[in-house]
Each structure stands twice: as structure tokens, then as C-alpha cells.
Amino acid sequence: MPVNPADLDRAQRALAAALDGSGPPVEFAEDGRAILRPEAADPAAGGAEGVVAVVRTSGSTGTPKQTLLTRDALTASAEATAARIGGEGQWLLAVGPHYVAGLAVLSRSIAAGTTPAALEPGPFTAQSFAAAVDRMERGTGFRALSLVPTQLTRLLLPGSSGSSTDGPGPIAGFGGAAVDALRTFDAILVGGASVPRRLRDAAAEAGLRIHLTYGMSETCGGCVYDGVPLDGVTAELVHDPASGVPRLRLAGPMVSPGYFDDPERTHAHFGVGTEADPDARWYLTEDTGTVEGAPGAPGGQRLAVTGRVDDVINTGGMKVSAAAIQRVLESLPGVHAAFAGSVPDLEWGQRVCAAVVPEAEGAFSEAAARASIRDRLGPPAVPKQWLVVDALPLLPNGKTDRQDLLARFTPPL
């Protein structure tokens, strides 16, 4: 979790130096320390020109990568974000700067000429959040914050199963210091994982000004807000011959030049030139979705992410979507959170599996869930193996730890 004030100051100064050219590229450690990475700006060493930061991730699949971010990309991201959310001002750092969401808070603060506040090191709780907001500057105008869904759940719905031990139940009438603190922000960016409808509804009922963001390290963080690409960003669907489903491709000035010292993966995911702009850099994601509208057309584009390429499950010769199964489960009464995936199976090829976090003991009905999935998605989508858990395991960035969950299911039959 975020850093102490002294480390935050050093982190921002290190990134500012990289951005203005007086210092080398940086990578942030989990404790907020700035690690100097001069080789990241050297193409001969596996880097790229103009690189100012490196974001190291392993992702939910466990495959490590080092994403290179350039001065131009971070600047474009900061400017487009300010234009979309309606202003620049002071940010609260609630996500570590070793994640792209935290690094983006620093780069946006540098662009705005402000100093971010930060949570103290330690577990993220409603109390620590409210205390951090109290330390923010008064009367500075625009305030912004970036959270992952797990954090917002702990603030809005602290009694939800598996989310926190801060309170005995949901905040009555959405009161309390943490929710009052959330209301002081002009913009709350929520991304990094899907946001359940229950959480979106709770945020709306509490009167919070949230923006659901979509993006990744390769796009300097969120580049699509509330389903609409930021200025300069375009989206299109590209057929993926391996999976047989279309993949989302994002293009714009905030796209990374690639991965450090990984030319094969860089070639597979990055390129230059789209139908709308022959000079635009693009990134081919691992996500599936829909895109409505054309770049520059009235109303612009709207994008919806429906799942991941590796979420497509081929079971008994039929293709089903793990993301669609998860959405059905999370729409059911008594279900707080859910996960759907697959494991190898000698008979079916891939066996559909599901894990469910119930709202309360005995609140989940497997029979009702089976019937709902069968009615809405068809018999092949009905999970053949179920787990009921107290909480979904999470990676440090708040995303569901897919590998942990899949390892819990029975080995191939």
C-alpha cells in the first residue's frame, strides 16, 4: 500500500526528473522507492527512445513483463484525463506507484503542478482512507482519486462478505467518515478489474462522482472512461485466428512503445498505423468486446469489454464465455462476488468451473444458479464444478488471482 510522505516526495521528484530530461527513467518498487533504469531509454539495450518509466507486472496469468512508458505517452494520458474528468488539482495516492494507476497519479500531479497526498503504509481501511483525506490541502479546488473495485467496496460496503472487517454491515444510509470523504472528490476513477453492478448502484446512491475506467499498463492506465475512449484514442476489433473471437485493439498517443528486452512479445502486441490514423501507435489487448461508432463520427465511439480471449472456454466442442457466466452469477440474489473459469478435462476438453462468495451463510443456491445459467446462456455454460468461498483471492493490484482459484479445482478426471 502507498508510501510515507518522504518516500512519496522522492518518488515524485524522480519521475519529474525523468519527465523533464534531467534524470534517467525510473521503476518504482513496492515500497515506493525509485529504481533508476537508464537502460530502458536505450534501444540497443532492449529499451526505446523517450522512455521515462518502467512498469513491471506479472498479471493474472503469471507471465512477467516490463512495460515501457514514454514522456509523450504519460503527458498525453495526463492531458486527456484532465480534459475528460473536468480539471486538474490535487490527487490522493491510494494505489502504490509501482502500479500504473499509482504512477499515473504522480504524472498527473506533475502535469498539474500539484503535490499528491497519500495513504500511510499499511492495510487499506475506511479509517486510514478518511485520515488521508483529512490531510489533503484545503481549498485547493479540484480533487481526484483512483481506486480499484476492492477498495471502493471496503469503503461503501464494509460488511460485504470477504471485503473487510471494518464494520458489522453496510453503512446505513451511506454515512460515516469514509463515505463523507469520498463525496469530497470531484472525480473518482475506478478500474483495474470489473465493477459489480451492486457496487456501481451503491456508488450512485451515495452520490459519488465515479468514472469506470478501462486500460492497462500498456496504455498508461485508463484510456476509456465510462465506455467512451479519451480524446485521441480509438478502438477497433481485430479477428484473432487462434481463439476465433475478435480482440480489442486500442490506438492513441498514450500507447507504450513495447516491453523492455522482449521483442517477440512487443511485435505481437504493438504496432503503428490504423485506418483512422496511419501514424497512431496501437496495442492489441487480450480482451474481447464490442465497439459502436466510428472515430470522428457524431457521438464518437462506445466500447464495452465482454471478457478475455483466454476466457473463451471450449467444452465438449461448444464455446462459452467465462465472463458471461460470472456476470450471470453476480446478478443473482445472495451472491456477493463470483469467478468462472476452466480446467483441463479428459472428457470435455475444458471443464467449466465457478467459485461463489455468498452474501451470507446459506444465501447461495447452486440449483438456482445452475438453472439461471442454463436459461440465459445454454446448457454448455453450466459449471460442472463449484466452490463456495469466504472471499476471492486477490493479487496485490486488486484483481482476482485466477491461478490461485483454478488450482483449487479438481485435477483432470
What is each residue range found by the language model?
Residues 241-273, 320:
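Conserved ATP/PPi-binding loop(s) of AMP-dependent carboxylate-activating enzymes
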Residues 378-400:
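AMP-binding/adenylate-forming catalytic domain of the ANL superfamily
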Residues 159-226, 236:
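Gly/Ser/Thr-rich phosphate-binding loop
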Residues 252, 279-281, 288-381:
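AMP-binding/adenylate-forming catalytic core of the ANL superfamily
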Residues 52-79, 86:
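Conserved AMP-binding A3 loop
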Residues 6-9, 38-56, 89-90:
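Conserved pre-ATP/AMP-binding loop-to-beta segment of ANL
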Residues 25-26, 71-76, 90-154, 211:
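AMP-binding/adenylate-forming
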Residues 5-20, 81-82, 100-112:
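Hydrophobic alpha-helical segments in the ANL/AMP-binding
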